[in-house]
């Protein structure tokens, strides 16, 4: 039977569809996604697996129906995001679990992964809604912030954390880098903030408590992280908030401003 069948579809994303077949996950990328980027993602995820973190093992890269696919281990279980949706009263408990997992991840050296600072620099440079002065200010701030050399996920939120029989597993490592734990935590804070302040503040509290760091040290990264996020949301509903967090004014003010 063809593994790429609607009956086997378990998820859709911006870049790929995800299928489950014969107890194996097939991440089938959309047409136009390059072989280089698929091989890169597979390599990053396998490096993370080899480092001892709980994440699906990569079996290989294949071509299916003219598209590239990553074949990987199936990690069964609901995401923490799904659990939070179904049981709102337990949301703080799940946030605390996620924070503890991120703190644990940040104890692992990130050598061999792409540079977080380089990623942030390139993203800020490409943001079309920021003026050159605003970009320069963010880059100067980035240079002034201390950088660790630890594993950073880059997109650490509840839907990328799976609760399995053996514990929590982390998926979707395409944005992984070697860099600052505080910056990675700040990115998570921002992702929560874009959906509501209450969860964002709760997560920040749990992370800082378990990492033994101050909220102020995490939030020092917020202008840089928000500025870099504009490469993803530069035309979306969140652009005004992101510009404000980045300490910048719109490059092209709307009428009446």
Give the ranges of each region predicted by the language model.
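Helix-rich C-terminal or lid/interface subdomains of diverse kinases
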Residues: 187-257
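Internal "kinase-insert"/substrate-recognition segments embedded within catalytic cores
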Residues: 88-117
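Short beta-strand micro-motifs within the conserved protein kinase catalytic domain, predominantly
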Residues: 57-68
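An alpha-helical support segment within catalytic cores of ATP-dependent transferases
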Residues: 107-154, 164, 250-256
